[in-house]
Amino acid sequence: FGVKVGIASTFRGNLIVGARAFHGNPYDGHTLNEQLEQATILMQDSAAKPATAFVDLGYRGVDADNPQVRIVHRGKAKRISEQERRLLKRRQAIEPIIGHLKADHRMDRCHLKGERGDRLHAVLCAAGYNIKWLLRMIAKKGVTFFAIGFFVPATSQRRGPVLAYIGH
């Protein structure tokens, strides 16, 4: 809808953990820090932070700006492990998510006014995608599966690093 929107999703389940609109047509590498910051803020209740970001080649050279996150892209082919090489192939999983946001969740056109409206629209489209994802999982796994997750204390749940796939 005229601005660049960055999407961050989890490694498993492709749940969107960050959606941010960037105005002024910025370079991809200059948007990564803000995108990771938003994903960290939105996941603060889960005590998990993005540890690794699998990105495309537009994010080359931003390793020094983000020392807390390991940035993996195709340009580092000789320096990445075999596991990271396999996970890098999964980076393409963000493309269908972006397609669904544009086609099914009305991200193709924003009817809200101004920069604030664009930012709000991106987050609301991502929230709609996540609600649809959650309803699909409830239908697939059953209501009792999710009810257990809400009543189990947070200290007993296993937590690990969240891998973010960043795409535009």
Where in the sequence are the language-model features?
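Helix-centered, glycine/charged polyanion-binding patches within enzymatic domains
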Residues: 44-120
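A short, flexible helix-boundary coil/loop motif
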Residues: 104, 108-109, 133-168
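Generic, well-ordered alpha-helical scaffold segments in large soluble proteins
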Residues: 10, 35-42, 97-100, 104, ...
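Polybasic low-complexity intrinsically disordered regions
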Residues: 1-50, 64
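Composition- and surface-driven signal marking solvent-exposed, interaction-prone regions
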Residues: 19-22, 33, 66-68, 112-115, ...
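Active-site proximal loops enriched in glycine and acidic residues that flank catalytic Cys/His/Asp
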Residues: 5, 9-11, 18-23, 35-36, ...
